[in-house]
Amino acid sequence: MLDWAILGARLLQYAGALILFGSSLFFLYGFGEGPHYAADVRRPWPHSLLLIAVVVSLAASLAWLMGETASLTGETRNAIYWTSLSSIVTDTGFGRLGAMRVGVLSCAAILLLARQVSRGQWTLQATMGAFVVASFAWSGHGSMDSGRAGLLHRGSDVVHLLAAGVWIGALVPLSLQLLRSIASRTRADAAVAERSLERFSGVGATVVATLILTGIVNSWFLIGPARWREIFTTPYGRALVVKLILFALMMILAATNRYRLVPALSASVTASSPTLPALKALRQSVCVETALAILVIGVVALLGTLAPPVSND
C-alpha cells in the first residue's frame, strides 16, 4: 500500500511541475503581444491553472518525502515525526533535493497568491517550474552514472524532461482554450484559440525531435546495445514499451492537429465560415492527447521505481 502511495505522489508531483513549467511558458509565447493580449491576461483561468499545478506538486512533494521516510525507516508512523523527516532531509541526497523542491514550489505559490498577473509573473513561474522539473533528473536513473557519462546522461535527462514539460504543459491550456471557445461560440475566442494553436505548432516539431533524440541517449545508458532484447522480458522494458506506444499515439494526434485540424480552423476563421465543427474536432483530439500525456506521466513515475536492464551488468 505504501509503495502505491509513493508512486501516486511521484505521478502528481511530476504532473504538477510539468504543467507549471510548460503552461507558464505557453502563456508567454502562446498569447503573444497582439491586440487580444490584454484580454488574455485578464482572464482568471491561466492564473488558476498555475495555482492548482503548484499546490498539487507541492502537496505531492511533501507526501513523497513522508512516504520515502516511512519506507526507509520501516515505520509508517515515522512519516509524521519531524525527527525522522529532518534526518532524511539532512542525511540523504534525495531528501535534500525534495526539500529544495518544496521550497521552490512554496515560493511559486506565494507569488501566485499575490495575484499579480503579468508576463513577469509567468516568466518567474516558468523559471521555478523548470528548476523543479530539471531536479527530477537527479532523483532518477540519471544519477546512476558518474564522470563524463554521468554528466551526459543527466544532461540528456534534464533536456528530455524540459521538452516533455513544454509539450504537456501546453496541452492543458490549449484544451481549456478550446472548451472556452466552444462554450462562448464567438469568432473572437475561436481566433484566439487558432492563434495559440498555430504558435504551439511551430514549437511542437522541435519538442518532438528533442524528445526522440534524448530518449535514444537515455535508452543507450539504461538498456545498452547488448541488452535491447530485455525490453520485452523485464518489468522496466515492458513499461518502456508502453510509454513508447503512448508517445507514438501522441505524435499521430499532434501531426493530425498540425496538418489537418488546425489548418481547417484557420480556414474557417479567415473565410468567416462556421468555426464550431473545427473547434469540436480539435477539442476531441487535444483532450485525447492530454489524456495520453497523463498516462505517459504515470508510466514515467513507475519507470523510476524499476531497475533498468543495465543495472544487471
Regions found by a protein language model. Give the residues of each.
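Polytopic transmembrane helical bundles with strong interfacial aromatic enrichment
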Residues: M1-D313
